[in-house]
Regions:
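Soluble non-cytosolic domains of exported or imported proteins
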Residues: 36, 40, 129-132, 224-227, ...
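Metal-dependent amide/peptide-bond hydrolase catalytic core
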Residues: 139-382
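N-terminal beta-rich core of secreted/periplasmic extracellular enzymes
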Residues: 1-20
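Histidine/acidic-residue-rich, glycine-tolerant segments that coordinate divalent metal ions
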Residues: 9, 20-30, 36-37, 53-173, ...
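Beta-strand secondary-structure signal
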Residues: 1-3, 63, 112-116, 177-179, ...
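Active-site alpha-helical elements of protease catalytic centers
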Residues: 31-49
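Glycine/charged-rich beta-loop-alpha catalytic/anionic-binding loops adjacent to active sites
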Residues: 16-32, 118-122, 271-274, 312-321
């Protein structure tokens, strides 16, 4: 199987100009994580693999999985929970990046929730004693969570944004909402931390005499590496090599590079294949859940100017011109070539499944971090 994504990010519209320039679209969204390339490149690879299977009369099956709402919606988790990936032996994925690599990577698990406080509105000056501020509930919760940071595992990450806080200073707000993310490499720690965040919310509601409700929005497992498949991808990526810019692309890249804040890579790194190593990313992805069920491996290709951060206007810009397309084409070629090796050497599947079984342990039973809730089709609406 090959995973594809296609969702954009709100507030990051951008033309393909090397200078910050908002695109005129209806919702202000932009492909700052390159999922337009991800989805198209994966579909392209699936078509090429199918063609190869037919032409060579090789027995096998290829499935392209279009997966929605990776950016906070955990689309793959619902698919995994409902058995959409059953009968798949190996799963490939890839992701746009500013470098070319096929590392054996882990990630943070995460879980999110929206916490809503309801109070009593009143005139903030003439009758404040008659009101109960929902915003006070949010702020009290945030204060307790911020104090909690001293007493959580070092690798944890907790972020929040206040999505509703009232409309006028002279009105005691009767509705307020805060949106929380909790992350850690261990999904069980994430589960525990989220429960502590809920307790902080409950305490805040009690202390401010407001009413609390909350909704789990999403939850992802950490990435489970599989060296058996990952090393195959690395060998194929190394065989194809990196990205070569034309003179026009080089000039464009130089202009983009000048706008980057403390870039970690240099111009020219797009030509390189990064050495194979174990790595950890502190972000999260719903590919994680898939990787605990099926041997899963992926690559990153330089669809952006070296040093570009994901979720930036620079990523949107490069992803909308030939640099992005070159990275996408490289990914499609690598996935296709790697798949043919597996069809020709089915013992890879046996080894990959044995590795996965040893990593997850014999007692592992999959339970989605987001529970049994239905997909939040409006999760971007605040």
């Amino acid at each position: 199987g090959i995973l594809g994504e296609f969702d954009a990010l709100p507030g990051l519209s951008q033309t393909n100009s090397p200078f910050q320039e908002k695109a005129l679209n209806s919702n202000g969204a932009g492909h700052a994580c390159g999922h337009h390339l991800f989805g198209a490149g994966s579909a392209w690879a699936a078509v090429m693999i199918k063609q190869w299977l037919i032409e060579t009369k090789t027995p096998g099956r290829i499935i392209f999985f279009g997966t929605p709402a990776e950016e906070g919606g955990s689309g793959k988790v619902y698919m995994a929970r409902e058995g959409a990936f059953e009968n798949v032996d190996i799963m490939f994925h890839w992701h746009p990046s500013s470098s070319n690599q096929a590392n054996s990577s882990t990630s943070n698990a995460n879980k999110s929730g929206k916490f809503t406080f309801k109070g009593i509105s009143a005139h903030a000056a003439s009758a404040p004693d008659k009101g109960r501020s929902a915003l006070d509930g949010v702020e009290a919760m945030n204060m307790m969570v911020n104090m909690m940071r001293e007493h959580i595992p070092q690798e944890s990450r907790i972020h929040y944004v206040i999505t509703k806080g009232g409309l006028a200073p002279n009105v005691v707000p009767d509705l307020a909402e805060v949106y929380y993310y909790v992350r850690h490499p261990d999904r069980l720690v994430v589960k525990q931390l989220f429960e502590r965040v809920v307790k902080a919310a409950e305490g805040a509601a009690m202390g401010t005499e407001t009413k609390l409700s909350y909704e789990v929005m999403h939850g992802n497992y950490s990435l489970m590496p599989n060296d058996t498949v990952q090393k195959l991808l690395h060998s194929q990526l190394s065989a194809f090599g990196g990205i070569e810019y034309t003179a026009a692309e080089q000039k464009y890249a130089e202009q983009i590079y000048e706008t980057l804040f403390e870039p970690s890579l240099k111009l020219g790194d797009e030509k390189k294949i990064m050495p194979y190593k174990q790595s950890h990313t502190y972000g999260s992805t719903d590919v994680g859940d898939v990787s605990w069920l099926i041997p899963t491996a992926g690559i990153r290709t330089a669809t952006w100017v070296p040093g570009t951060s994901a979720h930036s206007w620079q990523a949107v810009a490069a992803g909308g011109m030939s640099i992005g397309l070159k990275g996408m084409k490289l990914a499609a070629k690598v996935l296709t070539a790697s798949a043919t090796k597996i069809y020709e050497n089915p013992e890879i599947i046996v080894d990959a499944k044995q590795e996965l079984a040893s990593r997850v342990g014999e007692d592992f039973k999959y339970e989605a971090l987001l529970g049994d809730r239905d997909p939040p089709l409006d999760y971007r609406v605040n």
